[in-house]
Amino acid sequence: MPKVRTKDLIEQFQLELVSGEEGIHRPIDTSDLSRPGIEMAGFFTYYPADRVQLLGKTELTFFDTLTTEQKQERMKALCTEETPCIIVTRNQDVPDELLQASRESGVPLLRSAQTTTRLSSRLTNYLEGKLAPTTAVHGVLVDIYGVGVLITGQSGVGKSETALELVKRGHRLVADDSVEIRQEDEDTLVGSSPDLIEHLLEIRGLGIINVMTLFGAGAVRNYKRITLVINLEIWDQKKNYDRLGLDEEKMKIIDTELTKITLPVRPGRNLAVIIEVAAMNFRLKRMGVNAAQQFSERLMSAIELGNQE
């Protein structure tokens, strides 16, 4: 099922439907837009028919210089079965030839009061957000000191309980159990909660609680950029866990790699505090302060000094 249809643009941007009502359910599959200036001159060899077409003052001013026959020919070529819609900006008068071509082909013809540049920018941002690659991950997403931390792990390991403790300590819950993730850019992942379980937290033995009702609006967020993954796993005595922090694990979600930290879970460990510190330490690393690297350098200096003596 298409993520975006022409009718969504009409509703989102309050566009006037001039003609082509039967085509408002046409799918929009790309965030790229087209301003068919060269097409107005008759060059349709590389015409991107599957894009939203914007006709601004420049295009329509040139269009007025054409003969009646050329006008009819260009507008018929502009309206194809693939074209999701044509938008005339600045509330300009719609040419009769375009109106006729729209009625014959069923291509929705829309009009906006906004300038072409402004509308183009808003449309691109909207479509990129809606058409971005998406996935869902089992885990909890919490905003800790401005760092979007995705907490993962097997069911029953204590993710939700840890998130509850973090919320009590002043941090903000984004999603529990299922985190919907969309890739808005090459290195930007944004997580949010499904509408059905938004602001809800499931605690075994207690049931489902509404975090916003219990702790207030300041305890929740609707979405957050994910920059750190913390994986909780039951402590394995046979496994060697990182004790210095020099080696950095990575986890790939869609096409983006994120820093991953594995935390072993066993009685007596305060996971909420450890995750808080992990988030703060991650921020420090991004600011150029790496405690593990500093310790390693001190150790090497001490060894070299000892060898000289």
Swiss-Prot record:
Tree of life domain: Bacteria
Stretch list, region Important for the catalytic mechanism of both phosphorylation and dephosphorylation: 201-210
GO molecular function terms noted in the UniProt entry: ATP binding; magnesium ion binding; phosphorelay sensor kinase activity; protein serine/threonine kinase activity; protein serine/threonine/tyrosine kinase activity
GO annotation terms (biological process): regulation of carbohydrate metabolic process
Names of required cofactors: Mg(2+)
Annotated EC: 2.7.11.-, 2.7.4.-
Classification via InterPro entries: HPr(Ser)_kin/Pase, Hpr_kin/Pase_C, Hpr_kin/Pase_Hpr_N, P-loop_NTPase, Ser_kin/Pase_Hpr-like_N_sf
Pfam families membership: Hpr_kinase_C, Hpr_kinase_N
Function: Catalyzes the ATP- as well as the pyrophosphate-dependent phosphorylation of a specific serine residue in HPr, a phosphocarrier protein of the phosphoenolpyruvate-dependent sugar phosphotransferase system (PTS). HprK/P also catalyzes the pyrophosphate-producing, inorganic phosphate-dependent dephosphorylation (phosphorolysis) of seryl-phosphorylated HPr (P-Ser-HPr).
Swiss-Prot/TrEMBL domain comment: The Walker A ATP-binding motif also binds Pi and PPi.
Other facts: Both phosphorylation and phosphorolysis are carried out by the same active site and suggest a common mechanism for both reactions.
Designated name of the protein: HPr kinase/phosphorylase
